[in-house]
Amino acid sequence: VYSRIQGKTWWMTEHLFNDGENSDDSSKWEFLKWQYSLNHLGKEIRMCMEGYCSAYIYWYLKRFYGLMGDTDKRSPTSEGEITKNGYIMAHYAQYATETTRIKVVTNNEEVCATAYLDEKTGEVTIVLLNLNGASQWLEIPLAGIKKASAVETNETKNMEVIDTGLMESAEGITVLLSANSITSVRLTFK
């Protein structure tokens, strides 16, 4: 499908990620679970970005299945507070906006990645989804990195700063990805 739209502007709107919402039994509200958010919204946005999507539009900003909580009893957060879907979207909104998508490859089927170049600053950001139920060390072998920073969202963290380390060869960095997480790593080369 990507070859048919190459060179064209295209965009995607979210659809309802609200499985189980009609049940009176809150244990069936799948949309409240972190794993559900990561495997649905997280993967969908990543696939759109991988396909050079021009924009991903999320219509329902303030709704129990949206980016911010509302007064609905099914809301995972208090009214006006950011939901897990909101934090997933924030990784792309904060780290991919006004950048150029560049190619990135992982050698691990359970870690998905998209990368972005800020042509003004030369910074590169990699947004990583660890779809594994276990933490994983990741090496980013790029020469010339002067500074690296990372933030992560998982079941218990929301855009929290995490450590990065220099590889022994000094030709890249390492980062520990939590189980079932989305992590944004920003690399500075100047």
Residue locations for each model-derived region?
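Carbohydrate-binding surfaces of carbohydrate-active enzymes
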Residues: 89, 134, 138-140, 161-162, ...
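Aromatic/acidic polysaccharide-binding cleft in carbohydrate-active enzymes
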Residues: 11-91, 102-111
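Carbohydrate-binding surface patches
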Residues: 107-146, 180
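Acidic (Asp/Glu)-rich catalytic clusters
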Residues: 2-7
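A structural micro-motif
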Residues: 8, 54, 146-148
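C-terminal beta-strand-rich structural cap/linker in extracellular carbohydrate-active enzymes
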Residues: 164-190
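Hydrophobic, well-ordered secondary-structure elements that form the walls
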Residues: 48, 89, 126, 150, ...
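Solvent-exposed beta-hairpin/edge-strand motifs
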Residues: 142-159
